[in-house]
Amino acid sequence: MKQWPVKALFGKLLKVNHIFIMKRRIILCAAVLMAAVANTFACTNLIVGKNASADGSTIVSYSADSYGLFGELYHYPAATYPKGTMLKVYEWDTGKYLGEIEQARQTYNVVGNMNEYQVTIGETTFGGRPELADSTGIIDYGSLIYIGLQRSRTAREVIKIMTDLVQQYGYYSEGESFTIADPNEIWIMEMIGKGPGIRGAVWVAVRVPDDCISAHANQSRIHQFDMNDKENCMYSPDVVSFAREKGYFNGVNKDFSFSLAYAPLDFGARRFCEARVWSYFNKFTDNGKDYLPYIEGKTNTPMPLFVKPKHKLSVQDVKDMMRDHYEGTPLDISNDFGAGPYKTPYRLSPLNFKVDGQEYFNERPISTQQSGFVFVAQMRAHKPDPIGGVLWFGVDDANMAVFTPVYCCATKVPVCYTRVDGADYITFSWNSAFWIFNWVSNMVYPRYDLMIGDVREAQKEMETTFNNAQEGIEEMAAKLLAKDKNAAVDFLTNYTNMTAQSTFDTWKQLGTFLIVKYNDGVVKRVKDGQFERNSIGQPAGVMRPGYPKEFLQEYVKQTGDRYLVK
């Protein structure tokens, strides 16, 4: 087994941090340190209430899946502005200038999709009725996220800020589901415009119970909601009346379904979107079989918005779920002909295709090759904000990403998570984590089951090290925080940067290792992390894996006697 240098790198990290702390006259025992110690978006959000998590955290995840999206870690430093300052708004997807709005007098530090008060926002686009889009609006869904994070201290405050913004300036985007979370509660808010030239939006927000899990994945999921439960439900005053006016609904209020009115279900919404929610529910409840007929189109009875899990989920459980390809379920795509000889659980886009006039489809799992970035956000009410909020962040496909800890107080993001050297979606850089992780994953995709084991070893070693180090690092940060907040923030910023850089360096080494080991379709022999040599010092003989028996049988069936040895 190849030994990745994470422990050496982590030792370097601890040494640097120790020096950092010594400068502030805090003496720590080295033994304690070592004991502590690694197009339209098509996205997925997973949700875990604080009483459904193993450690009392609220947990939400987000994969930003889009061809064209460069994976980077955004940063908006805290700032103050004079009264009357204007903020230019650019569409997140395209960079198109949309207009100006009044800037807040005070904004908060935002790193990625979490702010310094542990408030986190994710999203998935459901589109909905196309006639409701308003191209005259100034606020797009991406701007709502990052402006909302810069101005809020709680999830409820975000909801008010976001809905006030679209009411005042107009909503530019399609229908959107937002996950809005803080250390105490998680909300799902769904929003759609009112049509060209009509300012504002119709929306509803529902609080996820603390003991439940939930998810959304590019299809509106809020059906009926309790209009009298002001503590757990918020909505625009015209959410029902507007649907009646447009002819989308003609029943009584209690029967109103936001989803059916504004985002009617079709095949793609069911199979490509709701199926990802089903996979999550199937994994962590005993009710997956009950919901499968809905995914297969045999019933129109929707899945519940939230469910109670059969056991409490850890942050690592959610990280692993973001790597899901329906393995072991009726929707598993790793064992049919489309998986090829090496059982790849990926399918190239487009999802739909035609053969002889008949339309077919490929499954769309949670983990997908076109992810720009992915995160699992951990928010904890029992810890101070600078320590309690951790954005476990990775770039590219979650299946082959490494989630590194990014603390919400960080005042500087790792260089490898930026547009270093001018890197973007069409500009490669050897110093960009997005491109290094894509380099590795695109080597693995064609020979998946031959190569994924090497990726898993490195991935597991990194993530296990970071997980095991978390408690000790946070104890150190808490001691600093008690004496000097700036010192604690600097320490966690330094830790955030060094873990990302060590991961980046390791992945570069992994890439070179994979090229050597699997070059030209053979496999080099490895022993104790080193490539083997023979008795005279030359490279040992290679292994020729060939093709699996099942693939060869299908190959002969397709080609007949063409390749028969006679």
What do these predicted ranges mean?
Residues 4-9, 13-27:
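Bacterial N-terminal signal peptides that target proteins for export
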Residues 27-33:
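Sec-dependent N-terminal signal peptides
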Residues 34-42:
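Sec/Tat signal peptide C-region and signal peptidase I cleavage site
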Residues 43-141, 161-313:
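A contiguous strand-loop segment
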Residues 145-151:
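Short, well-ordered beta-strand elements within core beta-sheets of diverse protein domains
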Residues 242-394:
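Glycine-rich, aromatic-lined ligand/substrate-binding cores of catalytic
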Residues 341-479:
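Substrate-recognition/cap regions that form aromatic- and gly/pro-loop-enriched pockets
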Residues 458-566:
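Histidine-centered catalytic/metal-binding microenvironments
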